[in-house]
């Protein structure tokens, strides 16, 4: 069978795609990179928020149009949209050949032979996948250390989709990282819905620190990057370890979502403004050159003008290197769905205003960056990223001279505009 893959959503979903794609290839199937050349189209969907649902449905319509025209024979759909809205998807798209759950991806070859809906319960544990391939570049990869979430934030659908938090055993994570290194990966990004909770279900308490200590012993390790850290679980011991090694990029992705205490409480974020500030100050003390990335939600139910002004002031004060701004989406099944909603126009206005605040922050950061030396990684001969930039979501840098892809090197910043910078390789 020749198959064409459409993988949507976050890096966690991408790792699922990498695992079942590798299973298919190992069993003699062929992956093609043009939909029109495929026998079957497989769509791994996202269903996290309304915009992701719309994107997934648009891709399903596209695939079914090709099937109707006789260009492809089958269409299979899996992923978070299926977990969350399987009945709705079946009703809207009865022409789908196979609709299958995330758990059913583990036996994808058998699953695709079946017609209709193939559902399996989410596994109670994670383990080293028997097959794995990279759907990104050869020098950077995502390593999922856990799946699911126990935080139960009031706006979030992830626990309904992915289930409770389940860590991958430490030995399996280390083996997977070792395989990545042997295959030429230079940058390993550790991901989960909450990376800093790693191990709490297996070892009785979070143990990301212990995992990092083992990963740092791997021969040939390039760099690690930590994504999706929660502020109330980012410990001083973790920060000290990061600050003491050059094998972990001095970068922390730490989604904060808000800073006003009334909003944080309604969000059920398990921390308050004081704790957030203490965590950020601690990170800056223990890792003086730390680069912080975060996300904020504006227009959350009952967010007042005072709350929003506090958020703007906070963004100006802490000067995040990278920042995502999202308008609150009202999602059925979440605690926030029943709360008093804010008009769409107000949410849109506040999002634009916060983006403008961050734009001015970036201008200030860029002025300080000119002439400084940063660690960088090459994604192609003429472009890449600094340690301040994660794959896919952050900014890019252009090189003044070619550097082989996958090279980690020192570079001097020669110009900077917004999130785009030009650097001069130094070695």
Model-derived features with residue positions:
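Conserved glycine-rich "GG(E/T)P / GGGxP" loop and the immediately following alpha-helix
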Residues: 47-52, 185-210, 214, 218, ...
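Conserved radical SAM core fold
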Residues: 194-198, 222, 231-234, 247-250, ...
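Proteins enriched for Cys/Gly/acidic motifs involved in redox and nucleic-acid/cofactor modification
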Residues: 1-198, 237-240, 248, 252, ...
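Alpha-helix-loop-beta-strand connector modules within alpha/beta enzyme cores
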Residues: 205-223, 276-287, 353-354
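Contiguous mid-protein beta-loop-alpha structural module that forms a pocket-lining wall or clamp
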Residues: 303, 317-320
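Terminal RNA-binding accessory module
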Residues: 330, 338-427
